[in-house]
Amino acid sequence: MNKLFEQRMQKLLQNDYPAFESALNQKPIKSFYLNPLKHGSIEHLNSAFLTKHPYINDAYFYDYENYQLGKHPYFNCGLYYIQEPSAMAVANCLDFDHDDYVLDMCAAPGGKTCFTASKLSSAGLMIANDINKLRAGILSENVERFGLQNTIVTNSDPVKLEKYFNNFFDKIILDAPCSGEGMFRKLDQAVETWSIEKVNECAYIQRNLINSAYQMLKDEGILIYSTCTYSLEENEDQVKYMTNDLQMELLEIKKQPGMASGYQNDKVVRMYPHLNKGEGQFIALLKKHTNGSVSYTHLRAHETLRHL
């Protein structure tokens, strides 16, 4: 493992570092959640290989070495979605209203999109966007398999989306591209490609995405900002930018089992493999306040989307 990364994590975790290092040598955990739109259930699954998730309804951990749920016919029918446990916690940290207009900015492969859109009614709208054409194709497949009728997949640069969705969304999910430190146990490539230069490059990209998200968020709208990395540059430093420069209000996230507070910040969430059944994750909730300085018209979806 990269020595600089080790030094940074030792400074961050202090006495918890040995437990964290040990957890990196253990096998990752897999999980899934049921599709409420198709009345998914575990009735016809082998419950011997399943463990109920402690705080997410209709979600389960499973023994992937002995039970290949990704090859089960129910998966191809969209009765459940397989998602990494910590990533599943992101969209679960906020309650969505049935008629919310929601944007998932960097949505592929679609776990957060499907989880959220299944909670919306026909009065709500989910725009699931990914700038990468190949990943947007995978996103479309997962949205179709899940049976979402209130979801539109776009393949666009968020800067372009700003022109059509200014002050439009009630809630935005920004699971930002990151240096992937939280995936070291799961992906060898994340370990091999890590560098401090990559951390700084990702932080720059994230800042631009945050600015786009702010423009597209309604007054009093809420942004879920998340990454699967540990660096302060990509997490708490970005939150400071949003609260100080953009004057957004940082909301406190209710801590669930396995969630830790952020670095010198009790309102955000950090997740580590030695504390929960999942990989690394950072989550923050922020509300936009413009004090009436920004006016907007909540356009009907088809009037806006026809220009994309």
Residue ranges of model-derived segments:
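A structural alpha-helix within SAM-dependent methyltransferase catalytic domains
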Residues: 117, 207, 211-214
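Core SAM-dependent methyltransferase catalytic element
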Residues: 273-275, 280-292
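Conserved Class I S-adenosyl-L-methionine
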Residues: 236-254
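Conserved small/polar residues in nucleotide/adenosyl-binding loops
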Residues: 297-307
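Glycine-rich nucleotide cofactor-binding entry segment
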Residues: 1-168, 200-205, 249-271
